[in-house]
């Protein structure tokens, strides 16, 4: 029986594991992989203490830091996805996709979120046939082509910036007039001569033959439909929390985020905390996720000493 199980491999989970080990709590971290969502980012400029770092390097650094503490107080199971959590009088029991079971007195969920799929006619047909969800992974395959980015957040504009380095042109489609991305990023990308931005647009359908060759969108102001020819479509329309395995265990909000007390990251269920993008916190960033986990660990430490 562990004192604490941590689910996840991103910044929140890594921070939780480091703090748990340093507090000498008998802990287990279970993750399918290390790094979180940022592993697909070409360059991260706001990871405090490092002016710039690639997403892949960040993932490697997180793993290295966690593994430094692997030993008497920290076990790590990598390559396993948690599929169920059962709460009982003694604590919690988790089960992985590979059939492994582990039990603990307390639980920190830092399972993050996944990419939202494009909702448009034929989007499923052309996934991996021109529709992709990772510019840094697949972008070079579209060198010299006209491409489209869907989404007006930081991820959308960062993807556009990457693609402008080798694509013929980039058209960014945004659902509204305003962008969720940082203003400095928006202005930098907009200034590129091969960049075009379309606002108030909803994607209706994707067409092609063997691969994508066009996208049709509707102007939400006029109702008119327009077609854009493109060889690739990069989707950056937000995230869906990875919390499906928790729906019968702890309260989730309308989109599946874990409801927490922001003062200590505790859920309404005693003995279970959550941190990072899987929670209903107002803001989500790598640095915030780490802070969430540290708050949670401080509270978990006190709770365990009261309830052991």
Predicted regions, residues:
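FAD-site-proximal beta/loop scaffold in flavoenzymes
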Residues: 114, 125-141, 237-284, 288, ...
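Internal hydrophobic alpha-helix adjacent to the cofactor/substrate pocket in enzyme cavities
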Residues: 22, 161, 165-172, 287-308
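Residue-level detector of alpha-helix initiation sites
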Residues: 10-12, 113-115, 154-155, 279-280
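A Rossmann-like FAD-binding core segment of flavoenzymes
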Residues: 66-96, 101-104, 165-262, 302-308
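Phosphate-coordination loops involved in phosphoryl transfer and adenosine-cofactor binding
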Residues: 1-3, 79, 128, 143-145, ...
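Short, well-ordered coil/turn residues at beta-beta hairpins
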Residues: 8, 110-112, 117-119, 150, ...
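Beta1-alpha1 glycine-rich phosphate/pyrophosphate-binding loop at the start
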Residues: 2-74, 157-183, 253
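Glycine/small-residue-rich loop that forms an oxyanion/phosphate-binding "nest" at active or ligand-binding sites
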Residues: 73-143, 152
């Amino acid at each position: 029986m562990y004192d604490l199980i941590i689910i996840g491999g991103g910044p929140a989970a890594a921070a939780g594991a480091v703090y748990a080990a340093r507090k000498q709590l008998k802990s287990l971290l279970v993750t399918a992989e290390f790094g979180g969502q940022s592993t697909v980012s070409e360059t991260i400029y706001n990871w405090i203490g490092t002016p710039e770092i690639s997403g892949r390097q960040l993932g490697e650094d997180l793993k290295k830091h966690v593994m430094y503490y692997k030993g008497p107080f920290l076990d790590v199971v990598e390559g396993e996805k948690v599929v169920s959590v059962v709460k009982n009088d003694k604590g919690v029991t988790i089960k992985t996709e590979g059939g492994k079971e582990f039990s603990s007195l307390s639980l920190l969920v830092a399972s993050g979120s996944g990419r939202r799929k494009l909702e448009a006619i034929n989007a499923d047909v052309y996934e991996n046939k021109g529709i992709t969800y990772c510019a840094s992974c697949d972008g070079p395959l579209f060198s010299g082509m006209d491409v489209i980015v869907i989404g007006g957040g930081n991820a959308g504009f960062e993807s556009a910036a990457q693609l402008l380095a080798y694509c013929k042109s980039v058209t960014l489609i945004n659902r509204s007039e305003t962008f969720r991305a940082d203003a400095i990023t928006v202005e930098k990308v907009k200034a590129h001569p091969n960049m075009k931005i379309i606002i108030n647009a909803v994607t209706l359908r994707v067409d092609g033959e063997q691969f994508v060759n066009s996208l049709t969108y509707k102007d939400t102001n006029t109702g008119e439909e327009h077609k854009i020819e493109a060889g690739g479509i990069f989707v950056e329309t937000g995230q869906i929390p990875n919390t499906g395995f928790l729906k019968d265990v702890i309260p989730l909000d309308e989109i599946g985020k874990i409801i927490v007390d922001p003062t200590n990251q505790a859920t309404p269920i005693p003995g279970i905390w959550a941190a990072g993008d899987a929670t209903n916190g107002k803001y989500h960033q790598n640095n915030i996720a780490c802070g969430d986990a540290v708050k949670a660990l401080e509270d978990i430490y006190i709770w365990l000493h009261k309830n052991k």
